[in-house]
Amino acid sequence: MSQPNQIHNALYLAFQRLQWSGLRESVPLTLSENDLADLRGINEKISLSEVTDIYLPLSRLLNLNVGAKQQRGLALNEFLGHVPPKRPYIISIAGSVAVGKSTTARILQALLSHWPEHPKVDLITTDGFLYPLSELKRRGLLQRKGFPESYDMKALVEFISAIKAGEPNVSAPIYSHITYDRIQDEQQWIRQPDILIIEGLNVLQTGQDSPVDTQRPFVSDFVDFSIYVDANESLLKKWYIDRFLQFRTGAFSSENSYFHHYSKLGDEEATATASNIWDTINGPNLTLNILPTRERAHLILQKGPDHMMDQVLLRK
């Protein structure tokens, strides 16, 4: 994460934590400590004060944006003289591995669902659209999992296009972090929510990032509001290693885990393994594919140590 520069100054309004928290106004805190415990990710220490200072103002901003979109829809309906299918407001959340995208998405889902104007809020991750493990092996992409070419982008765009068109029932594949693969014969059904949150590494990509296929639509073409969760790479690497060490004694210990062999590593060897995975896969993916999309986001959440937000950048 670079410090605010000329591009940031030209494109974004910058808010320090105290400034941003003041934009909450009278939005009530609807989550308890028990609720938050269920939403936290591995190795994250997000507190209720973080929800109050950062996420409540953000939920207010999103509620205002959803309301404005709904009003524009009503005006268009009146002009056209008919009522089109219900189309969800789509929010995307991008950022590096280990930055806390999933926790951000779950907290926003919980908060936004308490607004009476849009009580039905669904959440999906793009992980389900990774090619199956067998296909990744066939294509020689196993060591590039998470890179843009490891996703079935055609299926992902068809999914979000159907959502945006107001299709009543749209299915998405489900991914297992235990087996490191899609779950066979299981799907997540999206049935015309008021809001759909889509979380993934590459959801801000455009044709500029795919020179061999610039004309096809991208996920970002269908998104109403985009968020990028940002942090310095040294923090990201540390969080990834810390998470890996926790998985080693947790999820990896299951015999069904694709990474079960890592559970037998000692601390030093596990740390070295995680560091190597970061340096050869996650770090390069961040540098080449994820970080260059940051300035396309409508809002950037910048994290400091302990996953605490220290600045919010809102596009002008």
Swiss-Prot record:
**UniProt cross-references to Gene3D superfamilies, sorted A to Z:** P-loop containing nucleotide triphosphate hydrolases (3.40.50.300)
Q: What is one Pfam family matched by this protein? A: PRK
Subcellular location, record wording: Cytoplasm
Identify a single GO molecular function assigned to this protein.
ATP binding
The GO cellular component terms are:
cytoplasm
Residues that coordinate or bind ATP: G95, S96, V97, A98, V99, G100, K101, S102
Q: Which UniProt keywords apply?
A: ATP-binding, Coenzyme A biosynthesis, Cytoplasm, Kinase, Nucleotide-binding, Transferase
Q: What is its EC number?
A: 2.7.1.33
The pathway this protein participates in, as annotated, is: Cofactor biosynthesis; coenzyme A biosynthesis; CoA from (R)-pantothenate: step 1/5
Coiled-coil residues? none
Q: What is its main location?
A: cytoplasm
Q: What's the catalysed reaction?
A: (R)-pantothenate + ATP = (R)-4'-phosphopantothenate + ADP + H(+)
Gene Ontology biological process terms from the UniProt entry? coenzyme A biosynthetic process
Q: Which InterPro entries does UniProt cross-reference here? A: P-loop_NTPase (IPR027417), PanK (IPR004566), PRK/URK (IPR006083)
Top EC class for this record: transferase
Its family remark reads: Belongs to the prokaryotic pantothenate kinase family.
Which HAMAP family does the record cross-reference, listed alphabetically?
Answer: Pantothen_kinase_1 (MF_00215)
Protein name in the entry: Pantothenate kinase
Q: Taxonomic classification, please? A: Bacteria, Pseudomonadati, Pseudomonadota, Gammaproteobacteria, Alteromonadales
